[in-house]
From Swiss-Prot:
Cellular component per GO, a single term: cytosol
Family: Belongs to the RbfA family.
Role, per record: One of several proteins that assist in the late maturation steps of the functional core of the 30S ribosomal subunit. Associates with free 30S ribosomal subunits (but not with 30S subunits that are part of 70S ribosomes or polysomes). Required for efficient processing of 16S rRNA. May interact with the 5'-terminal helix region of 16S rRNA.
Listed GO biological process terms: maturation of SSU-rRNA
HAMAP family on file: RbfA
Pfam families: RBFA
NCBIfam families found in the cross-reference section: PRK00521.2-5 (NF001802), rbfA (TIGR00082)
Keyword Cytoplasm carried by entry: yes
Organism encoding this protein: Parvibaculum lavamentivorans (strain DS-1 / DSM 13023 / NCIMB 13966)
Primary gene name: rbfA
One function term, GO molecular function aspect: ribosomal small subunit binding
Protein name from the UniProt record: Ribosome-binding factor A
Length: 140
């Protein structure tokens, strides 16, 4: 007789649920609105332009990881650290914007997806790779 696979391991391979995606998008939009208002008083965040690119929410909706990227030149790690310092304030402002049973605990991480995409783009346009991708007359 075969054992049924546990739902936790099955859920881990499926990815986030529709509920998690919807909650993450709500938090991302509300967080962007709070930041746009300019009410954050941290000296490292005043006059700093950045984007909240993605918010991933845990299955129980108690934890949210917010990925941030500076617009233009800037240190993404320093930006994430500055936002972590004011996360209590941001969480309070979010609770006024979005209604959840429990407001998720916020963690901020630098978004490296743009850097990875740029690295892949550079690799694809490098002379070594482009010679492999160009059509050659091998039929002769």
């Amino acid at each position: 007789m075969q054992k049924k696979s546990s739902s936790k391991s099955h859920r881990a391979t499926r990815g986030p649920s529709q509920r998690q995606l919807r909650a993450g998008e709500l938090i991302r939009r509300a967080l962007s609105d709070v930041v746009t208002r300019g009410t954050i008083q941290d000296p490292d965040l005043i006059e700093r332009s950045f984007s909240v690119t993605e918010v991933r929410v845990s299955p129980d909706l108690r934890h949210a990881t917010c990925f941030v990227a500076p617009l233009g030149k800037g240190d993404a790690a320093a930006l994430a650290a500055a936002l972590t310092r004011v996360r209590g304030y941001l969480r309070g402002q979010l609770s006024k914007e979005v209604t959840f049973k429990y407001m998720p605990d916020l963690t901020f991480e630098p978004d490296t997806s743009f850097d990875k995409a740029e690295q892949i783009d550079r690799l694809l346009h490098s002379p070594k790779v482009s010679q492999d991708l160009s059509p050659q007359d091998d039929e002769e």
